[in-house]
Amino acid sequence: MKFIDLTIPFGIATPPWPTYEPLQVKYMKRLAPNGANGQIVSHSNHVGTHLDGEIHFYTPGKDIASLDFDFLAGDAAIVDLSDCCGDFDIYTPDMIEERVEVHEGDILIIHTGYHHFGWDQPYGNEVRYMVMHPGPDARFAHWCEEKKIKWIGVDCGSADHPMNTKIRDWMPAQAADCDAYFQETYGKSLPEIFTKDMYQMMHLWMFPKGIIHAECVGGDIDLLVNRRVQVGCFPWRFVDGESSIARIVAMVDEYEYQELMARKADLPKTKFGDCYDPVHVERLGGRGRTY
């Protein structure tokens, strides 16, 4: 068995979810005079590729240490929505099932393509990555429950639509752009589409049902879109942890791994060595406006 990394690089420049504490690192020992290098780190749980746990939003829920490996790893569907969703768009269960076969009890990884705007990417645009990515409607949340999805992964800042979170209040210019886009595209205003009772539904509705999610997935995800594969998420064994930084990988056999690595060799790379498919970037209009 071989692993394909679906985790973004983690460093002091990795942006946390807005208003959360970023990674900070300092040396507390050096080879001279201490004979060893040692570091102290501090950060929130919501920076880099991470798994949101139930108690992040649901007080009686499980902590991260309570999640067993049968839950964290297993059969998965990875779907690419970059051909149908752009800035502020809404995705539905139909869009997913038109592109990949999803079984009951699956892990579901959603490739919006917005990982291409992450801090580690040549087309980095933090505002698009955190504030303008696509997100789901209420039908999607109900469908996940019906499908008994184990957990969801997204390649952007949140499993919720950004304008169905506090970002709507923090970024009024983008909220106004989204409202205008919704009225033009869907015939309804932002408050009409994401009503008060739907607020952060992928967190507030889903976590009490045990359906949690990983955010900021990335790495070599472009190699594995619109297909089924084994996926594992490996957070800390974090007692009382509301969420956790995690390593997420896909698992393939040796023969397929060689095929995937041959394809990776033909694709452009980020400065950290992850590949990216220019087709996805072109669909989304390149870097887009910088703020």
What are these regions (language model features)?
Residues 1-291:
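Active-/binding-site microenvironments in catalytic and ligand-binding cores
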